Amino acid sequence: IFSPVGDAMRIEISRQESSELCRQYGIPVPAFHHVQNRLEARKLMQDDPRPYVLKNPICSPFSPIHAIVCESVTDTLGWIERVDYAEGLFLQEYLGKEEAGHFVFISGGEISSLVTNQEFKRAFTGDMGPLAGAPLAGIVEQDPDDKYGLAKELIHPLKPWFKKTGYTGPLQVTAIRKNGVWHAIEYNIRLGVTTTALLLRMLKNPVDVLLEVVRNQTPVLEWHAEKYFGCTLTLAGYGYPYVVPSVPKLPVEVSVPLECDLWWNEVDEEGGQLYMANHKNYEMGHRIADVNACAPVMDSAVKLIENEIRKLRCLGSYYRLDLKELAAKYSSLLTSEKAALR
């Protein structure tokens, strides 16, 4: 895994430590609380009633809790009665939907901005349905100059901590804007499934850059101007992301070769035929493939993906139909932010 090691990993692993670190260095964060059981959660809601996002305290794919976004106090009161408290519960104030992310490499004593992005984890078109474990769609924009100020506001203040821990590797901050102020809601120490494939396409020298970061050297970034924007769209398998009864080995068909990148996820091959992976002891729908495209302008990347993903077929599969609308919202959000910085 391409990430920092040792104490530098704590910024992702422990949500409470991450939030406290931000407060120490003057980075805005939502109100947050860590409780151990249902009684403590009930008491918290009496003392400080707000809508909260419910999360696992220790960031792990094997935790019994995955993020539940509560948009009202009533939502929160309902969910604190249902979650599994085996690892406790982290409650983070819900700040709204104006969300964006920014990636950097920290290497050679320098912070090098890479891309600004948005990820869309709601399962269905229109941002409806449950949060999936990984994004169903994503947008990435080259941003080595940090033109929206996300790195300046939410990453650069942590320089003393990076030096103290010997942090070397990638870092993503996910932030939500409320009342004109960006708040850090999460840090990730990996490039991530959505952004990595697009970022490496955007760079002219991806292998050289990765090797420079591994060696703790300042990376020399060279960008493809014609790949300024990138988009990704996931073909999700039968039942995803719900728990469903076991399904048969469903064939995955590609009518004609795609004219953009196709990344297979959970598929099996037998006799030259692809099938949606059938996990006999893991009864979940599965992510079949990601379709990625880069272009000089956002609209071109979106149009290419929408055309190409139609070439894939698997019974009961689906993908989000609102990538064009998501791209427009992304542009609107960050255009207003850029204007505010002038």
Regions found by a protein language model. Give the residues of each.
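Short, conserved charged micro-motifs
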Residues: 41-43, 74-78, 146-149, 240-245, ...
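Short, well-ordered beta-strand elements within core beta-sheets of diverse protein domains
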Residues: 137-140, 231-235, 287-295
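Active-site "cap" helix and flanking loop/linker of ATP-utilizing ligase/carboxylase catalytic domains
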Residues: 151-172, 188-261, 265-270
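Generic C-terminus detector
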Residues: 277, 282-342
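Conserved N-proximal alpha/beta basic substrate-recognition cap immediately N-terminal to
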Residues: 1-48, 52-53, 59-60
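Buried hydrophobic positions in well-ordered alpha/beta secondary-structure cores of metabolic enzymes
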Residues: 22, 55, 91, 102, ...
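Phosphate-binding core of ATP-grasp and ATP-grasp-like enzymes
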Residues: 84-88, 95-142, 151-184, 188-195
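Glycine-rich phosphate-binding loop of ATP-grasp-fold ATP-dependent ligases
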Residues: 31-32, 52-79, 96-103, 122-145, ...
